[in-house]
């Protein structure tokens, strides 16, 4: 296909137009008084959401060049989401501000490479300062505050996540389910999560989130490689009659058997998903046995004289729900408290008997996985549209609290970045010069962008608010919900340091890439069909733009 090539300023301005469109669509959701965005769906009701990365994923522009700008800034949001699980809107607003300020300097003749060096040095300095000012989370009250802010100022959600973490521990698994009632409820049940995802993405039942969610599945556990589909046929036929889904957890599934499972899944013959067993050697077998106890099934292993081709339904485990993504598998089981407790006692006994610190550590990991259980939050709402929005907010809140436990918390509401602005200026004036200093000044000028946008969404003058906040002590900021200047930590307005750090690093990375762009190669727009009905005479062969 023929390509369109654009150079220099024209290329950067085309990227900027795309970035402007995406940033504005996402920025309206920022802060406690941020608005919602409605996403049209080809099938079903429209989705009303307040989540930056979900909005960013939906935006596709007609102009290929502008769409490249959208894709670049979308990356800042999705990388922040991958790293910290929240802060995607902040990352987008920051990247947009840096790109705008940077392009003005490049247009005025500044060297883009040296500017990027300055941006990178300023970011490195700021990351150190964020870590310096972060406070470790000390109690469940701080966890609740973090969850509340990430869920869009919903106290109930924050408190529920704090309760869930109390029950399953800070490293515990918190899972989301669609509830049957109007209220959101918390329940703790047996379950575990391990670090292996589906073998093939074709097993995903939710293609938007790339997840496989199977309710009340049978679970086939085996420590052997499945090479031939013939080994599986007897058990697959039995399951097909029940109409229930199946999850296979095995050492590996080779191409022929995997292809057959995928074809059956895509044709709707059998709802199936396959996962590689976690661990290696004896540890893998022990973890599979743990899963067998948890799911009330048997591990099909030749050591016990069991063969796959002879497997029956009563050898299979069962669960309430299994959620599999590309990296992890979460099993929610129920009703096996006694068996799980006995297995935990057995692991504790092994820990007492072993002298190896490595073995002890691995046994402790297994014990934590088995004994910790899973906290299930059942999301309640009046309509399906509200339920989807609530689930996204809850997901952000869970991720934010986990990030806060990892790296501590800093004052929220854009306050930390705004206060770091004069500190960065002072450091840059002493340590940088020339165009590197200009690069650092670009970052410095952008640091107040999230706070300004939060204030503007609340109906205040962003520039005035930002200047006022900069003149106050580090912990003081603007509470957009009440319109007052308060001590952010005391008011419970806090952000995880990891979220603030990731957002800043990803924004600076994308801004640097855009500024150093000198040429864009994109597909030419396709010609419209000459015989398009209803067009004006002579307009048939026109381009899309």
Curated annotation (Swiss-Prot):
Enzyme Commission number(s) from the entry: 5.6.1.7
Subcellular location: Cytoplasm
GO biological process: protein refolding
PROSITE patterns in alphabetical order: CHAPERONINS_CPN60
Keyword annotations: ATP-binding, Chaperone, Cytoplasm, Isomerase, Nucleotide-binding
Binding sites annotated in the UniProt record for ATP: 29-32, 86-90, 413, 479-481, 495
Primary site of residence: cytoplasm
Pfam families: Cpn60_TCP1
Domain of life of the source: Bacteria
A GO molecular-function annotation: unfolded protein binding
GO cellular component terms attached to this protein's record: cytoplasm
Reaction equation(s) it catalyzes: ATP + H2O + a folded polypeptide = ADP + phosphate + an unfolded polypeptide
Enzyme's top EC category: isomerase
Record-stated family: Belongs to the chaperonin (HSP60) family.
Subunit structure: Forms a cylinder of 14 subunits composed of two heptameric rings stacked back-to-back. Interacts with the co-chaperonin GroES.
Entry function: Together with its co-chaperonin GroES, plays an essential role in assisting protein folding. The GroEL-GroES system forms a nano-cage that allows encapsulation of the non-native substrate proteins and provides a physical environment optimized to promote and accelerate protein folding.
Protein's recorded name: Chaperonin GroEL 2
């Amino acid at each position: 296909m023929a390509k369109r090539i654009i150079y220099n300023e024209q290329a950067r301005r085309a990227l900027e137009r795309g970035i402007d469109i995406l940033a504005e669509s996402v920025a309206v959701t920022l802060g406690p008084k941020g608005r919602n965005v409605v996403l049209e769906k080809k099938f079903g009701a429209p989705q009303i959401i307040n989540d930056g990365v979900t909005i960013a994923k939906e935006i596709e522009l007609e102009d290929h060049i502008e769409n490249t700008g959208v894709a670049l800034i979308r990356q800042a949001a999705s990388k922040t989401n991958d790293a910290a699980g929240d802060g995607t809107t902040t990352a987008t607003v920051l990247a947009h501000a840096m790109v705008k300020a940077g392009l003005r300097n490049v247009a005025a003749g500044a060297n883009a490479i040296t500017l990027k060096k300055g941006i990178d040095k300023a970011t490195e300095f700021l990351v150190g300062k964020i870590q310096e000012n972060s406070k470790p989370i000390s109690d469940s009250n701080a966890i609740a505050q973090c969850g509340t802010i990430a869920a869009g100022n919903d106290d109930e959600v924050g408190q529920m996540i704090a309760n869930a973490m109390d029950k399953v521990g800070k490293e515990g698994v918190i899972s989301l389910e669609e509830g049957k009632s109007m209220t959101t409820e918390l329940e703790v049940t047996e379950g575990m999560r391990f670090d292996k995802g589906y073998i093939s993405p074709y097993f995903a039942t939710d293609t938007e989130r790339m997840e496989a969610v199977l309710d009340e599945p049978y679970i086939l556990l085996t420590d052997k490689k499945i090479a031939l589909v013939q080994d599986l046929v007897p058990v697959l036929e039995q399951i097909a009659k029940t109409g229930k889904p199946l999850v296979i957890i095995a050492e590996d599934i080779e191409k022929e058997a995997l292809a057959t499972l995928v074809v059956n899944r895509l044709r709707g013959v059998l709802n199936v998903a396959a996962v590689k067993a976690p661990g290696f050697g004896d540890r893998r077998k022990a973890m599979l046995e743990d899963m067998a106890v948890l799911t009330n099934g048997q591990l099909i292993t030749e050591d016990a004289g069991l063969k796959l081709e002879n497997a029956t339904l009563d050898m299979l485990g069962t669960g309430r729900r299994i959620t599999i993504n590309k990296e992890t598998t979460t099993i929610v089981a129920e009703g096996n408290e006694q068996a799980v407790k006995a297995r935990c006692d057995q692991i504790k006994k092994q820990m007492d008997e072993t002298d190896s610190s490595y073995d002890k550590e691995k046994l402790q990991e297994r014990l934590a996985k088995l004994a910790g259980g899973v906290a299930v939050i059942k999301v309640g709402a009046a309509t399906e549209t509200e339920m989807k929005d609530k689930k996204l907010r809850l997901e952000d809140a869970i991720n934010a609290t986990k990030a806060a436990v990892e790296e501590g918390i800093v004052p929220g509401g854009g306050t930390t970045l705004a206060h770091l602005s004069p500190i960065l200026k002072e450091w840059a004036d002493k340590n940088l010069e020339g165009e590197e200093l200009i690069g650092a000044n670009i970052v410095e000028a952008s640091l107040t962008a999230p706070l300004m946008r939060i204030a503007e969404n609340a109906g205040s003058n962003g520039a005035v608010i930002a200047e006022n906040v900069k003149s106050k002590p580090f912990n003081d900021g603007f509470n957009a919900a009440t319109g007052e200047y308060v001590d952010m930590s005391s008011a419970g307005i806090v952000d995880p340091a990891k979220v603030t750090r990731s957002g800043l690093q990803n924004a600076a990375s994308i801004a640097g890439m855009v500024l150093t762009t000198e040429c864009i190669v994109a597909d030419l727009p396709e010609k419209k069909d000459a015989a398009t009905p209803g067009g004006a005479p002579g307009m048939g062969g026109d381009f899309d733009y």
